[in-house]
Amino acid sequence: MTYFAEYAWVDGAVARDVRLEITDGRFTAVTPGAATGGARLPGLVLPGLANAHSHAFHRALRGRTHGDRGSFWTWREQMYAVAGRLDPDSYFTLARAVYGEMALAGITCVGEFHYLHHGPDGTPYADPNAMGQALIEAAREAGIRITLLDAVYLTSSVDGNPLEGVQRRFGDGDYDGWAERVDALRASPGAKIGAALHSVRAVPAHVLGRVAGRAPLHLHLSEQRAENEQCRAAHGCSPTELLDKMGVWQPETTAVHATHLSPTDRDILGGQHVCLCPTTERDLADGIGPARALADAGARLSLGSDSHAVIDLFEEARGVELDERLATEKRGHFTAGELLTAATATGHASLGWDDAGSIAVGNRADLVAVSLGSVRTAGVDPAGAVFAATAADVTHVVADGRLIVDDGRHTAFDVPAALREALR
């Protein structure tokens, strides 16, 4: 298959008149300055976007949690109520619709941070991985790749209190129970199996290091000040420092959020992947993290829509810059190129897909066409489109060489109808 793009993001810049040749789902030729040829992709063509942090079932909360004042902790109770209702069939139905929404937004790969494992009282299903398999199948039907980040979740607090209520669905009893279940999961061409430490609240210190050898490995880090305070009270150090002592920080480890950090924490994270989720961090009143300081320390930034208050990686990308402006009262912290790299190449790398995220020969053929003629993007410099475009401007999406979104519609199913069905 051959595509032609008037504008395409190649080698960190906008190239003109680019012919893109694809064989067996990979780029075999990328030719800027080419004569017109192949199927035309309109607007600006980007590499596929990587959503590095997702909780698919949180999508059911969108627009339903704003009726009163509150905090992350009051929101969590509403989230637990949703978690208590799902089974493998309803989870598949919801996740398929959510991943379809991601495809419409130009996302070709998702990191699903998965901790909703068992039945309502904590009893495993006949297939102990039925919930995880539902997510993998949902991504396959939506046409996107998935890294299932199966989470260790053993305690309800840093003090080691047992799981209670709906949390019993999340736990496997101990590390060995979790490892036995996860080791039964199998990767496939469109799915990788990774690991997750839910947080220092949910994983005892002596277990942290036992998970460290698994990759990719993701974990929630210092999203709330209360987590830091509880960790210092229990262990005499910050969560970042505790994880460092336990050997968790490895090249393929990703810290998610990293909102409330000390200078020492930032230095430790300088060699890590860090996934930022600005729209969720705003929605839950988490705070503004030190994105520029982390990047300057050497952290490799990626992006996630997390709770799916919105599913729009353009909004996440510019949110990183705009939040820095609010915090510092200055402009110009991140270039468009840095933000697009976070949304593409480093996001894919954090999920274990090193052969995706850039338009280059040999890479997976993922393409996202973004309209430059909408009311949002008309007149913009293509190089700065990330500061204007939204998910609604995505017109075409190619994932592993297959067209999954054509003129704004999913080629496999009606996504709005699927969402209505899943959320009724």
Segments (PLM) and residue ranges:
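Histidine-centered catalytic micro-motifs
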Residues: P47-R59, P216-E223
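C-terminal cap of metal-dependent C-N hydrolases
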Residues: R364-R420
